[in-house]
């Protein structure tokens, strides 16, 4: 019969057929203990469990490796897992918990870092074996299994000794008092000594406690968030700071505080539970004043949901500002040497502080963080530019501040710190000149220019480098000043020769008479061509008074001709040896001549042994002699026999003919006729009056080509007047005026050197007479030739530089432009000399601009602006025309005058020559009218090619059918054009009315 064993109870299983008919009862068959199956525990060794644990660990590791390999092979899944792992849990706006995920870049960096770390770990620790041993020990009591527990201790097991730990007894700080007593004692000390106390809570919750004196009592005040501009629902936690607030109430007395005393500035006051305001407005034992709302005082310990409903009682902004101002002002104040008084009002002081604050830290609001960050993000150059712009925009406020002289130094400092280098054009020009040059001096100039370009932005290192380079350049320049500097002239010596010049023509016996005097022969006969035309006869019976003063355009000089009347009194005779001295000029660069960097001593002024210039003394006169010999004692040659009974003196402007007479001494007799005819017919018309020394030297060179024997001829004495830039050729009548420099040139060969263009000398441009008269005559010829085409064509052909003299007046330029003289000059010279043609092009363009300007000052400014360009072109042109030097001087004067006036205008000084310009323009207009009055109307019209262009400008073409109307319009146009300046609008309108 089947049965089921439940423990020690056997339950028989009844067949289903019997269960329906047989009545069963509660029968239980008890099985004997011997028949019950016993479940004995299986005894297994330690190695079995070790093997089983290793197997389970291996299976777990394989499953984990399979899972890791799955995630490692899928980069997207790896990225998501790493990003979630790095995410932080954050509370969302609706109270939900969300993940604050990092940026993708940080996640990728983390993944790459982990890969690198794993690879390094495999390389460094290859010996490490990871094994997991799991020991499972089933412990059964002896009563249940009857088997003793097996021990895993080895026979070498030994129990280690237990080390006793030394107990460190901390000294109790508060031995006899509680924590509350400690707080009270600390707060009392802080109250008495006015020390702020920092109260630190959890995380960032911290407040500063100070004690205020109110009505003779101390009140505790804690700092709150709204005082820093931060709004919070609960500004102070009572749970964290409750015991400290109660301690504050114990050491303060707040009974004197009333409701009406709570005003702005009371924020943070601490009131205890015994105060009536605490009992009225607070649900907590303490009241920390935050402000007021509609219901009354607001407690900072309690939550506030709407910030706008609360009127916070923090200190007033001006009070807070003044507290910070006073604190830092006192920290930075200098040491005082006097007792300060209140001499200025608070409003004025506030304005001054605001001006200086905005000058150095320009912001819209000092409390704005964006304004401060905006200034911190810009570079130093941009910050300085913003200060300069701010300085310019508020110039009126700065000008009002300048009225007080106490602020001048501060204004200069601020303005100097914000100024930038404006004239970058000059700096760029310097860089153009020195770039690509590797010499030491060019690099030094680059360093100096780089420092100057930066202006106030230059650093101290750059400034030190620039000063060092400047010092080296100065030392180098000082050692090489012998080229142009005055220091080199201190060592210049050009002593007079102690030996007399030997003239072979005067030593030949065949040319001397029995008295040893020179015999002119045929030379004397042909010299009449010079004496009759260019010399004036002196009649002794009429006296010598009118010949004493020798006039030249730049001044006067006294001759010693009056000393021909010799007194027999010794004292009076000695007075004839005394001269009249002019202002003596020192030795300058104008006294020397150089070529290829070397001095040409024969073309320089004579000096003494100490280097000072040799000044001329009285030159005694003689009768009927030709005096030659510049060095040593002079030689006296009798005049030709035909002229022996007469006395001659050269006319004004022709004293250079004495040089040609001295050359005539060395000319062969059979060639004397050709020599004198060339002088009279060719050279004198070309030289004219008062030619330059360069022109005279060129003429001597021409004569030397045809008559080579004249090159060794001795020259007359030549004195140099640097003040008037004049060369005085001394004849037999000497000179009573003394103090001139002496030219060392003694022969014609020496004189010819002045004709070289390579010779660097100012004296070669000196006139043997003067320049103003020459320039005035050229201007008169120019004005006369404006309306005379033949004369103008002759001027353009012979001396094109004369047109540059028209720049003295805008009226002359406009008239030459109307008559198309510039066009003729361009057509004539564009192929012959490109530089001269360029001058005419510039003059034509300049005149167009001048014609469009109505004011005289503006016209003169345009002319001055064009002068530097013309001056640069003129220096590269040939200087063999007589108008070259006057034109060059005119341009130089205009350039220098413009530069000087520019400096004066910048410094605020007016130009006082305006009246002079107006009067000069009126005189030129009168001169033009005077010259045109001499010409006939038919000549004015028929010789003017510009008449058709003038008619086109002022109106329509003349109707050929109406002769009377044609004559009337013709006369009106000619009168307007020839007598008035046609460049003004008034003249345009007059001509239009005349045409109608």
From Swiss-Prot:
The UniProt similarity line reads: Belongs to the potyviridae P3N-PIPO polyprotein family.
Residues forming the motif Involved in interaction with stylet and aphid transmission are: 365-368
User: Site described as Cleavage, positions?
Assistant: 313-314, 769-770
* Record GO cellular component, one term: host cell plasmodesma
Q: Could you state one GO biological process linked to this protein?
A: proteolysis
Protein name, as recorded? P3N-PIPO polyprotein
UniProt-listed Enzyme Commission number(s):
3.4.21.-, 3.4.22.45
Q: Which organism is it from?
A: Zucchini yellow mosaic virus (strain Reunion Island)
| Keyword Protease part of the UniProt annotation | yes
What positions does the domain Peptidase S30 occupy? 173-313
Residue ranges annotated as motif Involved in virions binding and aphid transmission: 621-623
Membrane-crossing ranges are none
Disulfide bridge map:
none
Source organism lineage?
A: Viruses, Riboviria, Orthornavirae, Pisuviricota, Stelpaviricetes
Which EC class does it fall in?
hydrolase
Keyword annotations = Host cell junction, Host-virus interaction, Hydrolase, Inhibition of host innate immune response by virus, Protease, Serine protease, Suppressor of RNA silencing, Transport, Viral immunoevasion, Viral movement protein
- From the Swiss-Prot or TrEMBL record, what is one GO molecular function term? serine-type peptidase activity
What does the comment on domains in this protein's record state? The N-terminus of helper component proteinase is involved in interaction with stylets. The central part is involved in interaction with virions and the C-terminus is involved in cell-to cell movement of the virus.
Residue span, Peptidase C6 domain: 647-769
């Amino acid at each position: 019969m089947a049965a089921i064993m439940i423990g020690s109870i056997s339950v028989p299983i009844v067949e289903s057929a019997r269960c329906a008919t047989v009545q069963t009862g509660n029968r239980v068959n008890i099985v004997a203990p011997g028949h019950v199956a016993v479940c004995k525990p299986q005894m297994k060794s330690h190695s079995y469990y070790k093997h089983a644990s290793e197997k389970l660990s291996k299976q777990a590791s394989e499953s984990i490796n399979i899972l890791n390999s799955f995630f490692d092979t899928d980069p997207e899944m790896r990225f998501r897992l790493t990003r979630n792992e790095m995410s932080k849990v954050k509370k969302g706006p609706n109270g939900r918990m969300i993940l604050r995920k990092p940026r993708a870049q940080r996640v990728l960096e983390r993944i790459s870092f982990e890969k690198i770390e794993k690879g390094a770990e495999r390389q460094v620790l290859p010996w490490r074996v990871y094994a997991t041993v799991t020991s499972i020990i089933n412990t059964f009591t002896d009563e249940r299994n009857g088997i003793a527990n097996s021990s895993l201790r080895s026979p070498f097991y030994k129990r280690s000794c237990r080390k006793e730990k030394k107990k460190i007894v901390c000294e109790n700080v508060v031995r006899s008092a509680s924590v509350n007593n400690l707080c009270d004692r600390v707060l009392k000390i802080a109250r008495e000594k006015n020390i702020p106390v920092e109260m630190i809570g959890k995380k960032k919750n911290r407040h500063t406690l100070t004690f205020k004196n109110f009505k003779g009592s101390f009140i505790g005040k804690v700092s709150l968030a709204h005082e820093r501009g931060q709004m919070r629902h609960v500004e102070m936690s009572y749970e964290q700071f409750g015991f400290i607030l109660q301690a504050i109430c114990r050491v303060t007395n707040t009974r004197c505080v009333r409701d009406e005393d709570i005003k702005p500035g009371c924020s943070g006051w601490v009131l205890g539970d015994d105060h009536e305001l605490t009992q009225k407005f607070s649900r907590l034992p303490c009241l920390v004043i935050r402000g007021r709302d509609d219901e009354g005082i607001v407690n900072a310990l309690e939550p506030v949901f709407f910030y706008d409903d609360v009127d916070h009682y923090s200190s007033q902004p001006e009070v807070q500002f003044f507290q910070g101002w006073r604190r830092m002002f006192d920290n930075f104040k200098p040491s005082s040497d006097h007792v300060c008084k209140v001499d200025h009002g608070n409003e004025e002081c506030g304005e001054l502080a605001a001006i200086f604050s905005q000058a150095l830290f320009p912001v819209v609001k000092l409390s704005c963080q964006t304004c401060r960050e905006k200034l911190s993000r810009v570079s130093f150059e941009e910050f300085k530019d913003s200060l300069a712009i701010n300085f310019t925009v508020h110039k009126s406020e700065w000008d009002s501040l300048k009225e007080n002289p106490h602020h001048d130094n501060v204004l200069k400092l601020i303005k100097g710190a914000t100024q930038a280098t404006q004239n970058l054009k000059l700096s760029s020009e310097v860089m153009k000149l020195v770039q690509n040059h590797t010499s030491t001096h060019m690099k030094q100039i680059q360093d100096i220019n780089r420092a100057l370009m930066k202006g106030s932005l230059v650093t101290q290192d750059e400034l030190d480098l620039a000063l060092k380079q400047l010092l080296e350049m100065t030392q180098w320049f000082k050692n090489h000043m012998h080229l142009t500097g005055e220091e080199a002239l201190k060592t210049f010596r050009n002593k007079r020769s102690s030996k007399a010049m030997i003239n072979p023509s005067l030593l030949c016996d065949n040319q001397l008479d029995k008295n040893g005097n020179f015999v002119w022969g045929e030379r004397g006969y042909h010299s009449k061509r010079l004496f009759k035309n260019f010399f004036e006869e002196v009649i002794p019976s009429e006296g010598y008074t009118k010949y004493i003063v020798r006039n030249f355009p730049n001044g006067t000089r006294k001759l010693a001709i009056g000393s021909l009347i010799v007194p027999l009194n010794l004292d009076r005779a000695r007075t004839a040896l005394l001269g009249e001295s002019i202002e003596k000029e020192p030795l300058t660069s104008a006294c020397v001549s150089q070529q290829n960097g070397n001095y040409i001593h024969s073309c320089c002024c004579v000096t003494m042994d100490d280097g000072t210039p040799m000044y001329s003394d009285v030159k005694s006169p003689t009768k009927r002699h030709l005096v030659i010999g510049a060095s040593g004692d002079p030689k006296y040659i009798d005049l030709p026999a035909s002229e022996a009974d007469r006395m001659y003196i050269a006319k004004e402007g022709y004293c250079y003919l004495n040089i040609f007479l001295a050359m005539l001494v060395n000319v062969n007799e059979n060639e004397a006729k050709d020599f004198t005819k060339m002088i009279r017919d060719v050279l004198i018309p070309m030289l004219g009056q008062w030619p330059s020394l360069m022109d005279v030297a060129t003429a001597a060179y021409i004569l030397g080509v045809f008559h080579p024997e004249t090159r060794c001829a001795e020259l007359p004495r030549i004195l140099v007047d640097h003040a008037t830039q004049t060369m005085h050729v001394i004849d037999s009548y000497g000179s009573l005026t003394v103090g001139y420099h002496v030219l060392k040139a003694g022969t014609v060969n020496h004189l010819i050197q002045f004709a070289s263009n390579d010779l660097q000398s100012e004296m070669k441009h000196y006139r043997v007479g003067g320049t103003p008269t020459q320039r005035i005559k050229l201007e008169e010829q120019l004005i006369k030739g404006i309306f005379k085409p033949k004369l103008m064509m002759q001027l353009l052909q012979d001396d094109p530089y004369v047109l540059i003299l028209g720049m003295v007046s805008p009226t002359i330029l406009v008239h030459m432009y109307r008559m198309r003289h510039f066009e003729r000059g361009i057509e004539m010279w564009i192929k012959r000399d490109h530089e001269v043609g360029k001058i005419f092009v510039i003059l034509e363009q300049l005149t167009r601009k001048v014609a469009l300007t109505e004011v005289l000052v503006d016209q003169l400014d345009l002319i001055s602006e064009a002068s530097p360009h013309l001056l640069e072109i003129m220096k590269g042109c040939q200087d063999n025309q007589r108008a070259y030097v006057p034109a060059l001087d005119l341009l130089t004067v205009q350039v220098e005058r413009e530069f000087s006036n520019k400096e004066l205008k910048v410094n605020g000084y007016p130009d006082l020559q305006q009246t002079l310009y107006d009067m000069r323009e009126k005189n030129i207009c009168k001169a033009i009218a005077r010259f045109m009055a001499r010409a006939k109307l038919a000549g004015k019209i028929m010789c003017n090619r510009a008449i058709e262009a003038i008619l086109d400008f002022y109106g329509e073409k003349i109707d050929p059918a109406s002769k009377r109307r044609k004559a009337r319009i013709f006369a009106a146009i000619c009168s307007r054009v020839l007598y008035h300046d046609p460049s003004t609008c008034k003249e345009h309108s007059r001509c239009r009315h005349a045409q109608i």
